[in-house]
Design a protein with these regions (language model features):
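Alpha-helical metal-binding/catalytic segments enriched in His/Glu/Asp
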Residues: 42-43
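Extended beta-strand/beta-hairpin segments
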Residues: 1-37, 48-154
Length: 154
């Protein structure tokens, strides 16, 4: 994977990848907000793709993410909480398994920060809070076997 960033004007930059390009408009949206959005988009896409591969449907998916950062430089993430809210035609156990599979195995961006950042999550499925402030069960970079689940290509 390769990304090239080129300065356009003032605090605007163009990011080019092999698949396309987009404009980064700082300080309207800061680079750390783009980074956070990328983290959330990675796991959110898994919560669509994993169920789809199991002939299940997810609707009304919203994922909120919040970080606490160092006050001093470098202002890295200390903790990261994800709040998943979605409906599906699966039971609560399967819905929780999709989130865990994304966080523990498939989402490359979350797994990139998990050794240095405390990551927690909550899940509201079909209107019911089924997990609250759960911690990731791994953190040392080890894989967890969830069987055959195909996720969004990174």
């Amino acid at each position: 994977m390769k990304v090239t960033i080129s300065h356009q004007e003032d605090m605007k930059f163009e990011a080019k990848t092999a698949k396309g390009s987009f404009i980064i408009d700082c300080p309207v949206i800061s680079p750390i907000e783009y980074f956070l959005a990328g983290l959330i988009a990675c796991t959110t896409s898994d919560i669509i793709v994993i169920p789809k591969n199991q002939n299940r449907t997810v609707t009304d998916l919203v994922v909120d993410g919040e970080v606490i950062r160092n006050e001093d430089h470098p202002r890295k993430f200390n903790s990261f909480h994800l709040d998943y809210n979605f409906n599906s035609d699966a039971d609560d156990m399967m819905a929780a398994r999709w989130v865990m599979a994304s966080l523990e195995t498939y989402c490359s961006t979350v797994n990139t920060i998990r050794d240095t950042t405390a990551i927690t999550y909550s899940i509201t499925h079909n209107g019911t809070l089924i997990k609250e402030n759960e911690s990731m069960i791994s953190g040392g970079g080890s894989n967890i076997d969830f069987g055959e689940i195909e996720s969004c290509p990174s």
